[in-house]
Amino acid sequence: MKYTLEICAGSYYDALEACKGQADRIELNSALHLGGLTPSLASLILTKTSTDLKVICMVRPRGGGFCYGEADTQTMYADAKLLLENGADGIAFGFLNEDYTIDIPKTEHMVSIIKQYNKEAVFHRAFDCTDDPYSSIETLIKLKIDRVLTSGQRNKATEGKELIKDLQSKYGNQIEILAGSGINSTNAIELINYTKISQVHSSCKEWLFDSTTSNTNVSYSYNGKDQYDVVSSIKVKELKDSLCGKQ
């Protein structure tokens, strides 16, 4: 069986690394240290012209949660259209109400935008913040979401494997289940074999040093070590090889 490897990319550089490591698909973002925000059009255009990767673009206007006011919502709709017009193969997004349920009208409208371009609608890990994963996934199916990214409502997919397995068993023939968070070359196959999913999402992260992140009196560091995170093509290839049974 062929397994799909999706890499969480935070830039055009990351996309190139994912391609070098033989990923099948990327979720293109910016600001991964905030959980991933909407990418620039330039990063999408460069990725599509330089690689053969399937590119799902994140549409998320800010950090924090997923209950959006009118300004953020309109920004998301407009961003989705621009990204789709410039070659995105799909859009990853999530709308929740204050009570942790799926915001049906906003989700429905976003899906309608995506389907105008015949592209994929992906509900991201906002799903992991919902109050009831079963009623939530049934709602997403009714709204014609193609795929849901989930860690099984735990911090790591390995911790949420029971729910992932159950969702795959009950709904896997109606919606694609994409497991993500904490997946690497050492645990991917075990998770796949246990849950019966066929695709995984990973950051394959490494850290690079930039001395200009701080000086004696000023710091722009977010991890305290004057480093920033990028995708490692070596880790991508290791994960890909593990999925292909080469390790």
Q: Across the structure, where does each feature detected by a protein language model lie?
A:
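Active-site-adjacent beta->alpha loops and helix N-cap segments on the catalytic face
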Residues: 13, 32-53, 71-73, 97-114, ...
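Catalytic cores of alpha/beta
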Residues: 10-20, 67-79, 128-143, 167, ...
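Structural motif corresponding to the early beta-alpha repeats
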Residues: 45-84
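Conserved, mostly hydrophobic/aromatic
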Residues: 18, 83, 110, 124, ...
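Glycine-rich phosphate-binding active-site loops on the catalytic face of alpha/beta enzymes
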Residues: 26-37, 82, 86-98, 145-158, ...
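C-terminal alpha-helical cap/extension of soluble enzyme domains
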Residues: 171-247
